[in-house]
Amino acid sequence: MAVKIRLARGGAKKRPFYRVVIANAAAPRDGDFLEKVGTYNPMLASDNSERVVLKKDRIEYWLGTGAKPTERVAKFIEQAGLTLPEKVKKEMDVKAKNRKARSSKQEAKEA
């Protein structure tokens, strides 16, 4: 079973609130999850300490078992001071390079 650390949306219309959850990769975004390991409230100011709240010990455990974070959650984990496995860092770098290449191709087409 592939396990991901990802965001599950909650809150009201136009007022998002996300739970950081450990879930089976095949499960729906807001469906069943194995464990809740934090919250993310994008409505709060970026310098607010309650904007991103993570259970660091549980995230370290799940990363150790092979769970892969999504890009957004990986950024939160790095900001919290936790280290990501090298494999995850490499995947993030490759995705960033591909994104830059796509955007530069699109800019060249438009020009």
From Swiss-Prot:
Pfam families: Ribosomal_S16 (PF00886)
The keyword Ribosomal protein belongs to this UniProt entry's keyword annotation: yes
Region feature (Disordered): 92-111
InterPro entries: Ribosomal_bS16, Ribosomal_bS16_CS, Ribosomal_bS16_dom_sf
GO-annotated biological processes: translation
GO molecular function: structural constituent of ribosome
Keywords assigned by UniProt, alphabetized: Ribonucleoprotein, Ribosomal protein
An annotated GO cellular component: cytoplasm
Entry-linked HAMAP family: Ribosomal_bS16
Family of the protein in this entry: Belongs to the bacterial ribosomal protein bS16 family.
UniProt name for this protein: Small ribosomal subunit protein bS16
Source species: Rickettsia akari (strain Hartford)
